[in-house]
């Protein structure tokens, strides 16, 4: 069993290197300051954006919606693109786009799909999305 898992991991690494090379990049959301001997975050390098502002229907115990208050709000697709343009000009390399959850646990990102594509294609930002729980 362990040998089988090791073989799968080795194969996955081989495929990864063939497609992406040996460099591994790590991104840390900017809402928390990180400083280690290997990495120090900056507030504008990889900001977090909420498409719901401070709204969250679930208010889960782990966050209670408080994390949303650390995020930049972008409530419309146009606001999202303009915010990302500004962030790019300020030196951002990417962003995390998320927001509060709806009652079913999803983050309402559907109407932002086209704007997210434009952010990637036109601005060249690395974009991560958190789609819900």
Regions found by a protein language model. Name each.
Residues 1-54, 58:
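Flexible, acidic/Gly-rich N-terminal and inter-domain linker regions that tether
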Residues 29-31, 37-40, 47, 52, ...:
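Conserved Radical SAM active-site core
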Residues 60-63:
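The canonical Cys-X-X-Cys-His
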